[in-house]
């Protein structure tokens, strides 16, 4: 399945999602690896097998095996970090902020792709997963590395569109009213 076939599966109530998917498919504001790694990481974070398969297939001709693994690692490591750091951020007890995380996350230091690509993918996944602490941390790293606010906003926009496609597919599976 590709982005085009994914668009074809979306019902009429998701027309805006279909149009937005077309927009990101044609968007060339990001470098190829940055864009397709971002889309794959976000698709995996959506936890929808059809969306993940569509974006994995779409990314196949645009990513090296190392970049594909890095995108998968971004979704995976943020799946862990977003839960932990969202808890730390939201818990009323300030003691949790002082405790060591004791979580292995070596891939962040050595992702196998340029640091800014990986950080952008982590930021987008963190937006999907709703971790404000991680969003702030990754946004700061990106800003300090000279990544523009427009690029950061584009990544989060792409994340929102991918997530909405997953929700639309799931909503379409609800049985019809009798």
UniProtKB/Swiss-Prot annotation:
Which keywords are on file for this protein?
Antioxidant, Disulfide bond, Oxidoreductase, Peroxidase, Redox-active center
A Gene Ontology BP annotation from the UniProt entry: response to oxidative stress
Q: Which residues form a coiled coil?
A: none
The similarity comment for this entry is: Belongs to the AhpD family.
> Its Gene Ontology molecular function terms?
alkyl hydroperoxide reductase activity; disulfide oxidoreductase activity; hydroperoxide reductase activity; peroxiredoxin activity
State which Enzyme Commission number(s) the record gives: 1.11.1.28
InterPro entries (alphabetical): AhpD, AhpD-like, AhpD_core, CMD-like
Name of the protein in its database record: Alkyl hydroperoxide reductase AhpD
Q: Which Pfam families does the record match to this protein? A: CMD
* Catalytic residue positions: 131 (proton donor), 134 (cysteine sulfenic acid (-soh) intermediate)
What reactions does this protein catalyze? N(6)-[(R)-dihydrolipoyl]-L-lysyl-[lipoyl-carrier protein] + a hydroperoxide = N(6)-[(R)-lipoyl]-L-lysyl-[lipoyl-carrier protein] + an alcohol + H2O
Query: Does the entry annotate any disulfide bonds, and if so which pairs?
Result: 131-134
Q: Which organism is it from?
A: Methylocella silvestris (strain DSM 15510 / CIP 108128 / LMG 27833 / NCIMB 13906 / BL2)
Top-rank lineage group of the source organism: Bacteria
Q: Which HAMAP family match?
A: AhpD
Its annotated function is as follows: Antioxidant protein with alkyl hydroperoxidase activity. Required for the reduction of the AhpC active site cysteine residues and for the regeneration of the AhpC enzyme activity.
Q: What is the lineage of its organism?
A: Bacteria, Pseudomonadati, Pseudomonadota, Alphaproteobacteria, Hyphomicrobiales
Q: What class of enzyme is it?
A: oxidoreductase
Query: Which Gene3D superfamilies does the entry mention?
Result: AhpD-like
> Its gene?
ahpD
């Amino acid at each position: 399945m590709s982005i085009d076939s994914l668009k074809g599966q979306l019902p009429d109530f998701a027309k805006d999602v279909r149009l937005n998917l077309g927009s990101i498919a044609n968007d060339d504001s990001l470098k190829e690896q940055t864009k397709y790694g971002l889309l794959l990481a976000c698709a995996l974070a959506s936890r929808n097998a059809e969306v993940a398969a569509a974006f994995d297939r779409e990314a196949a001709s645009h990513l090296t095996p190392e970049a594909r693994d890095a995108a998968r690692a971004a979704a995976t490591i943020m799946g862990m970090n977003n839960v932990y750091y969202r808890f730390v951020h939201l818990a009323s007890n300030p003691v949790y902020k002082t405790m060591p995380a004791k979580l292995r996350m070596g891939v962040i230091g050595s992702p196998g792709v340029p640091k800014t690509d990986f950080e952008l993918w982590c930021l987008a996944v963190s937006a999907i997963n709703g971790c404000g602490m991680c969003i702030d941390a990754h946004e700061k790293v990106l800003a300090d590395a000279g990544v523009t606010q427009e690029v950061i906003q584009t990544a989060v926009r792409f994340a929102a569109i991918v997530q909405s496609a997953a929700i639309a597919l799931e909503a379409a599976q609800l049985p019809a009213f009798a």
